[in-house]
């Protein structure tokens, strides 16, 4: 009986080992190919443009999904027997994704390098040559994602890399980081949301009304964030209204009712937010009744002192 017990224990251990051998841990079970369409911008669009070139459909690599890129997407979808709607969803990404490894070169490698730089600050030369530095960066990302660090960029690595959130860049001087709820490292969002906000902030900076304070967005891999009922899926970002003295990054916080509230400048800010993400702004919560009447913002409780942008 004792011997039978030892045999059963050994069998259970071997079964667990065999089952685990082919199933690497999945750190991001929510990982999925992003839905990318007209008006989107950012590092995912850059990768898309490189991958189109890898399939013989070169377009200008500008990080914006405009008419030229959309036309190339439609042509690619038609050639692959996919729904030719110009929307890059899971089936189109899956068909575009090219497995690359050390020794390969070309636009698909450039797509990998650009994504690693944008989402993991890899510091790679986006030269299209899959050398040792790129291989090490790929392995580091794979370890980070829990998908098996073999250095080969296959379907699972593409999906996790394209899904992974991006940190807002505060180094340009057009924005300043704020953490009103004490959430450290909470300025991550989808690549599209980040790029669209950065473009809006850059355009707004040209008005001379000072940099844009950015409150919480989300954590690197999403999930619950203290002080927020949303901000879990990388599509929600808080920014602060503009002051008449343009000191919104250094002076005290205001509401739309404060004497130092600059309605005209805040209106312009919302207009830039919408203009830089055509068709991709779900809503902007902010309780200024004038901006609400103009169709620029939507009323919601506790949104007197910040604008809550929800991208789609």
Named regions from a protein language model:
Residues 2-10, 17-18, 23-63, 68-71, ...:
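Acidic, Ser/Thr/Pro/Gly-enriched interdomain connector segments
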Residues 39-46, 63-68, 86-90, 103-110, ...:
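Soluble non-cytosolic domains of exported or imported proteins
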Residues 52-57, 77-84, 100, 116-121, ...:
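Sec/Tat-exported extracytoplasmic proteins
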Residues 67-71, 75, 79-102, 134, ...:
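Extracellular LysM carbohydrate-binding repeats and other cell-envelope/extracellular binding modules
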Residues 159-160, 187, 228, 233-235, ...:
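Catalytic cores and adjacent binding grooves of peptidoglycan-active enzymes
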Residues 196-228, 280-298:
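Extended, low-complexity, intrinsically disordered C-terminal regulatory tails
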């Amino acid at each position: 009986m004792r011997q039978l017990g030892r045999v059963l224990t050994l069998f259970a251990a071997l079964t667990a080992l065999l089952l685990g051998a082919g199933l690497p841990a999945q750190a991001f079970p929510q990982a999925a190919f992003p839905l990318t369409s007209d008006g989107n911008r950012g590092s995912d669009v850059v990768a898309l443009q490189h991958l189109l070139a890898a399939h013989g459909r070169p377009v200008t690599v500008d990080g914006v999904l405009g008419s030229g890129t959309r036309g190339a997407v439609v042509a690619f979808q038609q050639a692959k027997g996919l729904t030719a709607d110009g929307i890059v969803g899971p089936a189109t990404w899956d068909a575009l994704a090219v497995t690359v490894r050390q020794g390969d070169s070309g636009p698909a490698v450039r797509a990998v390098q650009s994504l690693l730089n944008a989402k993991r600050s890899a510091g790679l030369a986006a030269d299209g040559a899959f050398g040792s530095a790129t291989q090490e960066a790929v392995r580091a990302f794979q370890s980070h994602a829990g998908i098996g660090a073999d250095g080969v960029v296959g379907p699972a690595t593409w999906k996790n890399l394209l899904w992974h959130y991006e940190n807002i860049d505060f180094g340009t001087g057009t924005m300043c980081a704020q953490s009103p709820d004490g959430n450290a490292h909470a300025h991550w969002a989808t690549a599209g949301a980040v790029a669209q906000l950065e473009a809006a902030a850059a355009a707004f900076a040209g008005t001379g009304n000072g940099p844009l304070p950015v409150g919480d967005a989300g954590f690197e891999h999403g999930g619950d964030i203290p002080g927020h009922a949303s901000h879990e899926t990388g599509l929600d970002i808080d920014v602060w209204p503009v002051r008449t003295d343009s000191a919104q990054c250094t002076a005290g916080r205001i509401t739309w009712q404060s004497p130092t509230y600059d309605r005209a400048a805040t209106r312009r800010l919302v207009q830039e937010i919408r203009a830089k993400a055509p068709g991709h702004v779900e809503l902007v919560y902010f309780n200024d009744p004038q901006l609400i009447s103009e169709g620029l913002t939507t009323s919601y409780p506790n949104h007197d002192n910040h604008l809550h942008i929800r991208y789609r």
